């Protein structure tokens, strides 16, 4: 108060006022502070001071032709005096008002195109619904989130090239547009922005928003997709949340969601195939998500999820160095350990070989619904601080941490035998065996763990073996916290290796990911996922396998046909028949296969009844390992629509129906395509009459000398082979029959065999 009174007294003297308003500021330090560098030191003051002047704006001389000297009220809009130090004109703020009201108008057609992201945001907010506000403690954890909805996923460099090409097409500088998405976007934007009058720099900024993913590390409780993040400030505070449903979806969120589903499906499918890694790569390369190749999306999309990271590792891309266990992402924040193999005994006296981590370590554990901080020593949990959405989520985190700690009391809590297997019927490794066991039932684990009295610490409470909160006691070393644990913020990526069984390791050999870590959650993808690989036919169920298998045979009939007669074993081993085996009753697979292979062999040799439709129909059955048997079948069973349905060996059935008139095949009532060649008996031509007594083996084979004419054939001995010129001017290889009894069928067969050999 004293100071203020003193100042008031000073101000009342006229001399003080004069000193403060008239004298120059000549202290060098002050002048330096406000004049050095281009950076404005006090922008607000500068603005106020400038706007108080009559002509605070300078403009190009051309403005004098475009704006009158005075407005309707007679106020001066610009001054004839030049701006000191340049040949620009001094202009009044009133000129801006005049220009806005009376200046030239331009076409607005480009605005929604350039400012697309803003227009779309307004639409989403207009159609979004805001629910009630709830006051409660918010457990927020920092996660890396996508902050601009509606973007493509180009890298900064790719986007830069696209922007330069669209906005400054005539600038020099090498720009190589390689990826499909780059080319598509460039073409689309060039068309959209023809004759655009918006300042190029502005267009460039807006394009960047549209093309590049921008992420920030933000505290979030709830939805993390970009349409939720754009309203984060409206939906969650420190002690309140407001319910919100977005008024529209954006492609980038849909891509992320669909990518996770595709990756999970592919990893699950690859696990059960003979060579998981090769199968996984084949599927990644042949899958499209929303019309874009999955491998392109994987290269550009930073989504971190177990299955997605396994696919990235297989493609040789870098991934995050954190590892996954029990669906939680672990990041070591302190300490170190060495691995030693130890044998331990479970409560059921089963021996397990586990890799023990010796040493003190600290980890953060982050899951979808719970997070934790874990401190552990060799086979001992020292402290676990958990926070989660609900009791269930907290329990999940506690189980994972207890198993991860490798404590003896956890291993002794096992009741019964551990024999969990993965999808391919292989035993899981011991750590996952333990995890599965306790995820099924953790009662004994929690009961045996032990409890301890707890101190009263702010924001922490205890949790009892039955998962109820307590202020006095808690599971040994375990506390529940109100505060979440932040996700690992670094975006650093490391080089990893992957083995045949899809186990991903860092360069120190630590396992970061394995198929056991891939979530079993099923979801419906937002974008269409097109799996071209035959391995994924079964994703849509047995009917799809059946239809796809027959469609594949018909589409590739030309090559299948040749392999059928010349290299059947290679044909039977084709990957495309793999899925079909799951439809054939296990007990019958090898019998069916033996029967069909024998039948085919007879068609090739003696009987000569080459029947296209029958080959197509029975071929998938021949793919199983055959059992030699003399069994005959008139129909073969496949398991579809929840029961066994029959395919007739001779003739049509609801499962496999060939229409001779239209030459189209329907499988389970679905069209499976048309046969390009005529499988009917047809009319036997002249050759077939003449070739009676000869078996057509296939195409010309030079080892059997020059082609004979049909008349010269009669000189061949039984069993002798020769090339023969037939009427179409084609050469085929034939063999004179060793026995005469099958001569009758030769004439029917010859037509087809010739056709086949020629094709």
Swiss-Prot record:
Cellular component terms per the entry's GO annotation: host cell nucleus; virion component
Localization terms from the record: Virion; Host nucleus
Intervals of motif Nuclear localization signal: 736-739
GO MF terms, alphabetically ordered: RNA binding; RNA-directed RNA polymerase activity
One BP term from GO: 7-methylguanosine mRNA capping
Major localisation: virion
Annotated site (Avian adaptation): 627
UniProt entry keywords in alphabetical sequence: Cap snatching, Eukaryotic host gene expression shutoff by virus, Eukaryotic host transcription shutoff by virus, Host gene expression shutoff by virus, Host nucleus, Host-virus interaction, Inhibition of host RNA polymerase II by virus, mRNA capping, mRNA processing, Viral transcription, Virion
InterPro entries xrefs: Flu_PB2_2nd, Flu_PB2_6th, Flu_PB2_C, Flu_PB2_CAP-bd, Flu_PB2_middle, Flu_PB2_N, INV_PB2, PB2_helical
Pfam families in alphabetical order: Flu_PB2_1st, Flu_PB2_2nd, Flu_PB2_3rd, Flu_PB2_4th, Flu_PB2_5th, Flu_PB2_6th, Flu_PB2_7th
Subunit comment: Influenza RNA polymerase is composed of three subunits: PB1, PB2 and PA. Interacts (via N-terminus) with PB1 (via C-terminus). Interacts with nucleoprotein NP (via N-terminus).
Family: Belongs to the influenza viruses PB2 family.
Functional note: Plays an essential role in transcription initiation and cap-stealing mechanism, in which cellular capped pre-mRNAs are used to generate primers for viral transcription. Recognizes and binds the 7-methylguanosine-containing cap of the target pre-RNA which is subsequently cleaved after 10-13 nucleotides by the viral protein PA. Plays a role in the initiation of the viral genome replication and modulates the activity of the ribonucleoprotein (RNP) complex.
Protein's UniProt name: Polymerase basic protein 2
Gene that produces this protein: PB2
């Amino acid at each position: 108060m004293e100071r203020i009174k003193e100042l008031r007294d000073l101000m009342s003297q006229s001399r003080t006022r004069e000193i403060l308003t008239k004298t120059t500021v000549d202290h060098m330090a002050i002048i330096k502070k406000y004049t050095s560098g281009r950076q404005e030191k006090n922008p607000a003051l500068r603005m106020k001071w400038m706007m108080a002047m009559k002509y605070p704006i300078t403009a190009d001389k051309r403005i004098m032709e475009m704006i009158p000297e005075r407005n309707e009220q007679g106020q001066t809009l610009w001054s004839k005096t030049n701006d000191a130090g340049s040949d620009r004109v001094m202009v009044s703020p009133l000129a801006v008002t005049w220009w806005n009201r009376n200046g030239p108008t331009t076409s607005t057609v480009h605005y929604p195109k350039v400012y697309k992201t803003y227009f779309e945001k307004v639409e989403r907010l207009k159609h979004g619904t805001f629910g009630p506000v709830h006051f409660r403690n918010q457990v927020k954890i920092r996660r890396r989130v996508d902050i601009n909805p509606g973007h493509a996923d180009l890298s900064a460099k790719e986007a830069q090239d696209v922007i330069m090409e669209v906005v400054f097409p005539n600038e020099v500088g090498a720009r190589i547009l390689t990826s499909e998405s780059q080319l598509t976007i460039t073409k689309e934007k060039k068309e959209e922005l023809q004759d655009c009058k918006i300042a190029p720099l502005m267009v460039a900024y807006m394009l960047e928003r549209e093309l590049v993913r921008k992420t920030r590390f933000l505290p979030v409780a709830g939805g993390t997709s970009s349409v939720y993040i754009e309203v984060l400030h409206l939906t969650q505070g420190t002690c309140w949340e407001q319910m919100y449903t977005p008024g529209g979806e954006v492609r980038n969120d849909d891509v992320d969601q669909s990518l996770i589903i595709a990756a999970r499906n592919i990893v699950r499918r690859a696990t059960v195939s003979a060579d998981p890694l090769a199968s996984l790569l084949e599927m990644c390369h042949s899958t499209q998500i929303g019309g874009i190749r999955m491998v392109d999306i994987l290269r550009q999309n930073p989504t971190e999820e177990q299955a997605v990271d396994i696919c990235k590792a297989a493609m040789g891309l870098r991934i995050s160095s954190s590892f996954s266990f029990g669906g939680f992402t672990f990041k070591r924040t302190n300490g170190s350990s060495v691995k030693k193999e130890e044998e331990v005994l479970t409560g059921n006296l089963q021996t397990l070989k586990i890799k023990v981590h010796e040493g003190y370590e600290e980890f953060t554990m982050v899951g979808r619904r719970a997070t934790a901080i874990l401190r552990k020593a060799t086979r001992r949990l020292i402290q676990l601080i958990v926070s989660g959405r609900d009791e269930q989520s907290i329990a999940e985190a506690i189980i994972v941490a207890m198993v991860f700690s490798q404590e003896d009391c956890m291993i002794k809590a096992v009741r019964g035998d551990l024999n969990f297997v993965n999808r391919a019927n292989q035993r899981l490794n011991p750590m996952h065996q333990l995890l599965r066991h306790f995820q099924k039932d953790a009662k004994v684990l929690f009961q045996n763990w032990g409890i301890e009295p707890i101190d009263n610490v702010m924001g922490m409470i205890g949790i009892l073996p039955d998962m109820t909160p307590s202020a006095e006691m808690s599971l040994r070393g375990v506390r529940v916290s109100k505060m979440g644990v932040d996700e690992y913020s670094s975006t650093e990526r490391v080089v990893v290796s992957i083995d045949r069984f899809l186990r991903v390791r860092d360069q120190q050999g630590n396992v970061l990911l394995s198929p056991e870590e891939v979530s079993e959650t099923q979801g419906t993808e937002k974008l269409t996922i097109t799996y071209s690989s035959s391995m994924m036919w079964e994703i849509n169920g047995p009917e799809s396998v059946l239809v796809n298998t027959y469609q594949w045979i018909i589409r590739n009939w030309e090559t299948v046909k040749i392999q059928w007669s010349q290299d059947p074993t290679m044909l039977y081993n084709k990957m495309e028949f793999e899925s079909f085996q799951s439809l054939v009753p296990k007990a019958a697979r090898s019998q069916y296969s033996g029967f069909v292979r024998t039948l085919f062999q007879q068609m090739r040799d003696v009987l000569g009844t080459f029947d296209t439709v029958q080959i197509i129909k029975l071929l998938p059955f021949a793919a199983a390992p055959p059992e030699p048997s003399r069994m005959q079948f008139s129909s073969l069973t496949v398991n579809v629509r929840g029961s066994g349905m029959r395919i007739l060996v001779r003739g049509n059935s609801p499962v496999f129906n060939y229409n001779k008139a239209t030459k189209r095949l329907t499988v389970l009532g679905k069209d499976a395509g048309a046969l390009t060649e005529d499988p009917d008996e047809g009319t036997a031509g002249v050759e077939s009459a003449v070739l009676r007594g000869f078996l057509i083996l296939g195409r010309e084979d030079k080892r059997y000398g020059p082609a004979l004419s049909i008349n010269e054939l009669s000189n061949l001995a039984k069993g002798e082979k020769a090339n023969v010129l037939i009427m179409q001017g084609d050469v085929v290889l034939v063999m004179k029959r060793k026995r005469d009894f099958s001569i009758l069928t030769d004439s029917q067969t010859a037509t087809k065999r010739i056709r086949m050999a020629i094709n």
